[in-house]
């Protein structure tokens, strides 16, 4: 099931060897969070390379960087892959200690669970609540992703449960198969990038609106011209009196 579909061009561009060749765009910083073995690393690599790799060593928080084009705009995208040892029974303090740095750093979030692992689904709510605690203004976009949608025979989390949770939290929900559908994976990251860009633009508009324009100060040429005009007027007045 795909509750959301996106269209438009979204192309990967290699990172230049020398950053001096480019005027680097504003960074977009995303974090992918979730329990272990839900496919976070596979999602990121699938998006960046179009390749699906099923088995990964437990990660310790790898950071991926790419220049990408979103609807014709070049952006510097960074994606933080987070450690996956978080389960619903873990204490809040354990979760905060392991993820707070990434949550503070990122501007947009993917919360990933596996439809074959109900405990990974249960970890989504505390992750969401922690993000909102760190970003209390509620502006940071958060998407909930049910991964491994191709493993229907092993499903433990129904689609309506993902939708219900997303509705309760006020988040967007997608159910995808990283292994079978690259386009769905691309749509997830593409749409999240667009939401982060939207937040940036709204913030910029508010800052511009709050700035009071300074009165234009006369420059030296203006002052000289006015001085000459004053002298000329004074001379004409003197001649008329004589």
UniProtKB/Swiss-Prot annotation:
**Top-rank EC class of the record's enzyme:** hydrolase
* Disulphide linkage map: none
Q: Which Pfam families match?
A: Ras (PF00071)
Q: Can you say where in the cell this protein is located?
A: Nucleus, Nucleolus
- Reactions mediated catalytically: GTP + H2O = GDP + phosphate + H(+)
Region (Small GTPase-like) spans which residues?
17-241
Q: Which InterPro entries match?
A: P-loop_NTPase (IPR027417), Ras-related_GTPase (IPR051065), Small_GTP-bd (IPR005225), Small_GTPase (IPR001806)
Instruction: List the EC numbers from the record.
Output: 3.6.5.2
Please give an example of a GO cellular component term from this record: nucleolus
Q: Name any one GO molecular function.
A: G protein activity
- Provide the binding site for GTP: 34-41, 81-88, 147-150
Q: Does the keyword Repeat apply?
A: no
Which SMART domains does this chain map to?
A: RAB, RAS, RHO
Q: List keywords of the entry alphabetically.
A: GTP-binding, Hydrolase, Nucleotide-binding, Nucleus, Transcription, Transcription regulation
**What is known about its subunit structure?**
Interacts with UBF/UBTF.
- Which family does the UniProt entry place this protein in? Belongs to the small GTPase superfamily. Ras family.
Protein name, as recorded = Ras-like protein family member 11A
Q: Which organism is it from?
A: Mus musculus (Mouse)
**What's the name of its gene?**
Rasl11a
